[in-house]
Design a protein with these regions (language model features):
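Single-stranded nucleic acid-binding surfaces, predominantly the OB-fold ssDNA-binding core
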Residues: 1-102
Length: 102
């Protein structure tokens, strides 16, 4: 099973873009508080960028604002690329369901 689920706060406005194939997309920056404190008792945050596609991208870019809370379910994807004869692997997060938590 390939799935993730987060609840976090939007930190920047997403910009709606269109691919050469006509698909709508945007990147949604979200700050998520960790569910455990560090050694000083402080709950730190993780900043993530979530890929949003098609109708979800249009809705998110038109409806959200900085500071809004969202719940996101999705999948993790990987991309391989080669540089200087070394193979690298990048991971990204793709939204499949977005709930606006206002």
């Amino acid at each position: 099973m390939n799935a993730f689920s987060i609840v976090g706060k939007i930190t920047e406005m997403p910009i709606l873009k269109e691919t050469t194939n006509g698909l709508k997309t945007c990147e949604l920056p979200v700050r998520v508080q960790r569910n455990f404190p560090n050694s000083d008792g402080v709950y730190e945050n993780d900043d993530m960028v979530i890929e949003v596609w098609r109708g979800h991208a249009e809705t998110v870019s038109a409806s959200c604002k900085i500071g809004d809370y969202v719940g996101i379910n999705g999948r993790i994807h990987s991309r391989k690329y080669q540089k200087d004869e070394k193979v690298y692997l990048n991971y990204g997060f793709v939204a499949e369901k977005i709930d606006f938590l206002r």
